[in-house]
């Protein structure tokens, strides 16, 4: 009797698991569709003839395939310069931010650091309170950062959230490693570069992704500090201007105004703000999409281990 009852419970449990797995699979598929469709639709519009796109009806694949939208984008000297600035601020900003954040995190993770609690509190307070937009602008002006590339790097060189994550990760490392190194005569810099930094690679990869995405997607600091410096514009800022022009063209209600003829009045090769916007969106999204799979294995591990003591 007991065997029969256990067999019945096991069969019922298997049925419940099957129903749960099926519903979970359907839900995840719907979620994937919701996330992928906007990107696939944007890709289809960017690969479709601009004049044909005005008719609408493009969903997952282009109706009249063309690469002219991308040729038009890459043919703009300003966009090439903006792309160079975006790459430079992402590379330099990420490297400096990760290095400085890791160094400060190591410092405040040491129990014998006298100002450990005060320094931590000072950083944490900046997460909740700031000086405001106008005082920040005045500070950047007094520091002679307006009109400079470094205005993109220095103000956000240390992210408090990233700092807390790295500090918690370092605090979780065996203290015996540092004690042994100290007995052997190693100084703080040696312990940081030879012990802490190599062991922090998972969390370093995690915050590197955070900082890189932030730097690559930033446009408001360009709008605020360097709107009149074309040589310091970024791809995201140029995309924002294209979006504004597109909205202005749509609001005017004139389809003719939406077309930009690119070759001396030729009607065979045209682009619209919508087609250029789609191409620009794919271009600025592609680097992050390509980088993320390589950092994904570190992402959950680094964030989880770094947040245990946070």
Regions found by a protein language model. Name each.
Residues 2-310:
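A hydrophobic, multi-pass inner-membrane permease signature
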């Amino acid at each position: 009797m007991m065997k029969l009852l256990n067999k019945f419970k096991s069969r019922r449990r298997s049925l419940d698991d099957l129903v749960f797995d099926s519903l979970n699979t359907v839900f995840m598929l719907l979620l994937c569709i919701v996330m992928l469709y906007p990107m696939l639709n944007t890709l289809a519009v960017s690969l479709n003839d601009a004049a044909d796109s005005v008719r609408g009806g493009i969903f997952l694949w282009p109706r009249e395939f063309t690469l002219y939208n991308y040729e038009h984008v890459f043919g703009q000297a300003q966009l090439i310069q903006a792309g160079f600035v975006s790459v430079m601020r992402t590379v330099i900003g990420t490297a400096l931010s990760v290095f400085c954040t890791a160094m400060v995190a190591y410092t405040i993770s040491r129990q014998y650091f006298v100002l450990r609690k005060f320094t931590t509190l000072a950083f944490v307070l900046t997460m909740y309170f700031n000086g405001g937009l106008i005082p920040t602008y005045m500070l950047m002006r007094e520091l002679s950062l307006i009109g400079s590339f470094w205005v993109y790097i220095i103000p956000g060189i240390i992210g408090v959230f990233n700092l807390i994550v790295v500090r918690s990760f370092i605090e979780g490392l065996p203290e015996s490693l540092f004690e042994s190194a100290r007995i052997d005569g190693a100084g703080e810099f040696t312990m940081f570069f030879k012990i802490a930094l190599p062991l922090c690679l998972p969390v370093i990869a995690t915050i590197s992704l955070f900082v890189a995405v932030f730097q690559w997607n930033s446009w408001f600091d360009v709008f605020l500090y360097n709107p009149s410096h074309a040589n310091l514009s970024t791809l995201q800022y140029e995309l924002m201007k294209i979006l504004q022009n597109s909205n202005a063209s749509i609001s005017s209600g004139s389809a003719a105004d939406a077309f930009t003829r690119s070759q001396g009045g030729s009607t065979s090769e045209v682009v619209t703000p919508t087609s250029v916007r789609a191409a620009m969106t794919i271009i600025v999204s592609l680097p992050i999409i390509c980088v993320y799979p390589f950092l994904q294995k570190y992402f959950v591990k680094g964030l989880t281990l770094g947040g245990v003591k946070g």
